[in-house]
Regions:
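Condensing-enzyme catalytic core mediating Claisen C-C bond formation in acyl metabolism
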Residues: 28-103, 111-112
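Stable alpha-helical structural segments in soluble proteins, enriched in small hydrophobic residues
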Residues: 95-103, 134, 163, 167
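Single conserved hydrophobic/aromatic residue that forms the stacking wall/gate
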Residues: 1-9, 173-176
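Conserved beta-ketoacyl condensing-enzyme motif
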Residues: 6, 10-16, 107-123, 138
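Conserved catalytic cysteine-centered active-site region
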Residues: 20-45, 128-158
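A short beta-alpha structural unit
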Residues: 75-80, 112-120, 145-152
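Short glycine/serine- and small hydrophobic-enriched flexible loop segments
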Residues: 56-59, 161-168
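Active-site-adjacent elements of ketosynthase-type condensing enzymes
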Residues: 12-34, 52, 78-94, 118-130, ...
Length: 176
C-alpha cells in the first residue's frame, strides 16, 4: 500500500501563524503575553477552547418560552483578502459600518467594542485606528485573547459569550 501525508495533515494548524511570524516569543510568560493593544505586544499566543451559541429566530424563541440571553440585531462582514496578518483599517471600519447599518443604529449607540485583538502590531494598529475613526476616542476596546490566547475557530463563540455576560453584569474586562 502507498500512504500519502500532506503537510496540512502533518502539522497543526497553529503552526501557520508561526510561518507568518505572527506568534509571540513570550509563550513562557502567560501573565504578560499576549498583550493586545499594548506597546509591548509581540504577537498572538495560541489557546485552546471550544464554544457554541444556539441561534434562532426571536419569534420562535419567544413562542417556546426560551430564556433569551442576547439578540443579534445587526451583522457586518468584510475582508480585504490581501494578507492574513496585515488587515486594512478601511476594510475593518467598513465591516463595523455594515453592522451598524444592518442594526439601524448610530455609532453613538455603542458603548463597548470587543475587538479581534490578536496582539500583532499591524492587526492591532489597524483595528484601533478603524475603531477610533468610527466610534471616537471615548470607545473602550478590549479582547479576551489577552486571557485565553487565540482559540482559532472557537474565538468568535467564546468572545461573544463573554460579551453577553459582561452586558448582563454591566461590566467590562480589562486587558490581561
Amino acid at each position: 500500500e502507498i500512504y500519502t501525508l500532506s503537510l496540512h495533515d502533518a502539522l497543526p494548524f497553529s503552526m501557520v501563524f508561526d510561518a507568518l511570524y505572527a506568534t509571540s516569543l513570550k509563550n513562557d510568560a502567560p501573565h504578560t503575553s499576549p498583550r493586545p493593544y499594548d506597546s509591548d505586544r509581540d504577537g498572538l499566543v495560541i489557546g485552546e477552547g471550544g464554544g457554541m451559541l444556539v441561534l434562532e429566530e426571536l419569534e420562535h424563541a419567544l413562542a417556546r418560552g426560551a430564556h433569551i440571553h442576547a439578540e443579534i440585531v445587526g451583522f457586518g462582514s468584510n475582508a480585504d483578502g490581501a494578507h492574513a496578518t496585515r488587515p486594512e483599517q478601511t476594510t475593518m471600519r467598513r465591516a463595523m459600518e455594515l453592522a451598524l447599518e444592518d442594526a439601524h443604529l448610530s455609532a453613538d449607540a455603542i458603548g463597548y467594542v470587543n475587538g479581534h485583538g490578536t496582539a500583532t502590531e499591524q492587526g492591532d494598529i489597524a483595528e484601533t485606528l478603524a475603531t477610533h475613526s468610527l466610534f471616537g476616542a471615548r470607545m473602550p476596546i478590549s479582547s479576551q485573547k489577552s486571557f485565553l490566547g487565540h482559540t482559532l475557530g472557537a474565538c468568535g463563540a467564546l468572545e461573544s459569550w463573554f460579551c453577553i455576560e459582561m452586558m448582563k453584569d454591566r461590566k467590562s474586562t480589562r486587558l490581561n
